[in-house]
Amino acid sequence: MSYNSFGHLFRVTTWGESHGPAIGCVVDGVPPRIPLSEADIQPFLDRRRPGQSRFTTQRREPDIVRILSGVHGGVTTGTPVALQIENTDQRSQDYANIADRFRPGHADIAYHWKYGVRDPRGGGRSSARETATRVAAGAIARKILGERVRIRGALVQMGRHAIDRARFDWDEVDRNAFFCPDPEAAKAWAEELDAVRKAGSSLGAVVEVVAEGISPGLGAPVYAKLDADLAAAMMSINAVKGVEIGDGFAAAALRGEENADEMRMNEDGTVRFLANHAGGVLGGISTGQPVIVRFAVKPTSSILTPVHSVDSDGDEVDIQTKGRHDPCVGIRAVPVGEAMMACVLADQLLLHRAQCGETGAGRLPLAKK
């Protein structure tokens, strides 16, 4: 197995390289009779598309998606849905000077050691270009989840500077180039990233993804936990080096009573939580609260600043990477994180239906004895 697929029942296989003729994915396990067209997928690709501001790569890709199979008469047929996105703006010559050199912090040397051969053009298979296919698959996953489920992502930290949570406003996310929910932070980030970009360097970031409208009961103990699948999905995104669910690492500093998501009864007999430190998941199973995931994205490895490295002959060299690269790859990771959240939730929904049917006990009020 080459590990180019993820998911259990809703299973996505991606293919293609950064500078190949096209990239794409095959989405298996899509239920039949779901309305689907390219128009349902394209808006999500447009949010991730490169070249939309000076803060992202200037590679100009239209990212137009084509559905090749699995849809007839405007609805899914239950067979694999194949999607293709053409690459139209490659500049492979930009990578000629690093064909035999390994970029520090990049997958170059790891791919070389594993396979004995690699595609240096734009990073080949390890390029963030691959994530466009995940966004396309995520659009299909959203169709399975339905309109009741809302998935939103935001950049909550760039470099050392985090947002002010008191100013968190989801309406601000699509009003700036950073998917930032804090307008003041967005202004400060613009100044800082301009300086970093002009210096030929890059910054890391933290992305937060929140899913609301999730029914209780998704996920299963012990090896199909919802949070385990979410962590694996987010960690599979290029440049991601850490993931947390809910309070995550901050929970280690809390006492037990502080970390507890206390509960009370509503008048209709349903349960309400007084907090959400767990991020909507307990015991690997959704609680009905918002599912909250954050992931850390390292600074872009391809930078103009000269750094020390080695080449394939074993000589020590200095390397300066030309080409068009994101000064902060975390920005365009926001729609990718949303897509991975959607894929995992759709997968877990199908697994839940397979075991428990359309409804589970979590939808019912607690009966008083």
UniProtKB/Swiss-Prot annotation:
One of its GO terms (molecular function) is FMN binding. Pfam families: Chorismate_synt. CDD domains: Chorismate_synthase (cd07304). It catalyses: 5-O-(1-carboxyvinyl)-3-phosphoshikimate = chorismate + phosphate. Its EC number is 4.2.3.5. FMN binds at R125, S126, S127, N238, A239, G283, K298, P299, T300, S301, S302, R324. Its cofactor is FMNH2. GO terms for cellular component: cytosol. NADP(+) binds at R48, R54. The keyword Lyase applies. GO terms for biological process: amino acid biosynthetic process; aromatic amino acid family biosynthetic process; chorismate biosynthetic process. PROSITE patterns: CHORISMATE_SYNTHASE_1, CHORISMATE_SYNTHASE_2, CHORISMATE_SYNTHASE_3. Belongs to the chorismate synthase family. This reaction introduces a second double bond into the aromatic ring system. HAMAP family: Chorismate_synth (MF_00300). Homotetramer. This is Chorismate synthase.
